[in-house]
Design a protein with these regions (language model features):
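Class I S-adenosyl-L-methionine-dependent methyltransferase catalytic core
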Residues: 2-46, 50, 54, 58-67, ...
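Conserved AdoMet
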Residues: 62-120
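Long recognition/docking surfaces used for binding and targeting
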Residues: 105-115, 122-161, 169
């Protein structure tokens, strides 16, 4: 898409690049707060795989979580690579960045946006403005959208379409800074699995990727992965796309949920990659009596909509014990827990795992923790 942009330097000034010239090599990427370094690692790995040099990457450039700023490389190629990332939500090409005055911020935003040159707006039949606001202000994101949208309509005369626009302009406010961007992703990249069964609560695919990232999965042909709280199947589907040779197993205490996960797997074309069954994670020895796994990656109940009746101290203790028995020597357990203090206490008390990494992430307005644990093997095990 032809695009005239204002290249944003790190000192906040702008430099215009014409639609015929080379686009500036800057990207603004969003993810779950707490996963910024996961995005960085994935991007650098994809650049290495493509034979491209590393680029400058800044985490949380505006002081708020879930942000990654990228500079370097050829702009369109970098955008293509960014659009393939599995750990992110949206990709933006910055157009203009400016500081907001203490008074009259909305008017200032409207004035700045009205004179902004965006070649894509010249030919677009429809557009929309979206906004995210972080910090303390006397206005909301909807106010920003209305004022910026009115400015672009006056400038270009392009019709507004809030559902399916040709062009989406993002106007974000971070404290006293405003960033105007061209949004390359019309829907979140974390919403990549089309399901027949969509539960009310499902793990975001981006967070599933992060769990797999912390598992440090290798490339052995006989490696196996289990999700004993598989739900609708997000972790297994993510693993199926990333690791073509990994044998996948899933279980859930609810037979209906298992049936729905099978339907989802069929819809995604990966039913042949995984074995799903009904079973209680507190009794994995009975569910998988003859099988041990290299990795267990899972998302146990948080105790909000599901698992409200559980004694989580006993629950986590039993799950840790069963995971230890079902993991091979050298195995790894990665899970996300909302009641993280209880989980930490259970992990220390059982003494079956060594904590390798712990991370707070934001997902769905909650702040659970990812735990990556290595199995503590007994002498003489094989």
């Amino acid at each position: 898409m032809s695009l005239m942009v204002n290249s944003v330097s790190r000192d906040g000034t702008t430099q215009v690049t014409s639609a015929q010239g080379e686009c500036p090599s800057q990207l603004f990427i969003t993810t779950n707060p707490g996963m910024e370094d996961v995005v960085r690692d994935e991007l650098l790995e994809r650049l290495r795989a493509a034979g491209l040099p590393p680029v400058a990457i800044e985490l949380n450039p505006f002081g708020f979580g879930g942000q990654v700023w990228v500079e370097g490389g050829e702009a369109e190629r970098m955008c293509q690579i960014a659009m393939e990332l599995r750990s992110i939500h949206h990709v933006f090409q910055p157009l203009h960045r400016f500081s907001l005055p203490p008074q009259g911020a909305l008017q200032h935003i409207e004035s700045e946006v009205e004179v902004l040159g965006i070649a894509a707006m010249e030919t677009a039949k429809t557009f929309r403005v979206t906004s995210r606001r972080s910090g303390e202000h006397d206005f909301g994101s909807v106010d920003v959208q209305r004022r910026a949208g009115a400015a672009l309509w006056r400038h270009y005369g392009t019709a507004v379409d809030l559902e399916n626009p040709d062009v989406e302009v993002r106007v974000d406010v971070f404290g006293c800074m405003c960033l105007v961007s061209f949004q390359r992703t019309l829907k979140s990249l974390s919403k990549r699995f089309v399901r027949r069964y969509q539960p009310r609560v499902a793990l975001k695919a981006s967070v599933a990727y992060a769990l797999l990232h912390f598992a440090r999965i290798g490339e052995k042909s006989d490696d196996t992965l289990l999700d004993p709280f598989c739900g609708s199947g997000t972790i297994l589907f993510e693993a199926a796309e990333i690791f073509p040779d990994l044998a996948l197993f899933g279980s859930d205490i609810d037979q209906h949920v298992v049936d729905c996960a099978r339907e989802n797997a069929s819809a995604l074309g990966c039913a042949g990659r995984m074995a799903l069954c009904q079973g209680d994670a507190r009794g994995l020895d009975a569910v998988f009596p003859d099988r041990r796994f290299n990795y267990i990656v899972t998302n146990p109940p948080y105790g909000m909509r599901f698992g409200q009746h559980l004694n989580f101290d006993r629950f986590y203790t039993r799950v840790l014990q069963q995971c230890w028995y079902r993991l091979r020597p050298g195995g790894r357990l990665v899970l996300i827990a909302w009641k993280y203090r209880l989980f930490s206490r259970a992990a220390k008390r059982t003494g079956l795992f060594c904590l390798r990494a712990e991370r707070v992430v934001e997902t769905g307005g909650l702040h659970p923790r990812i735990f990556a644990l290595d199995r503590i093997d007994r002498e003489g095990e094989n």
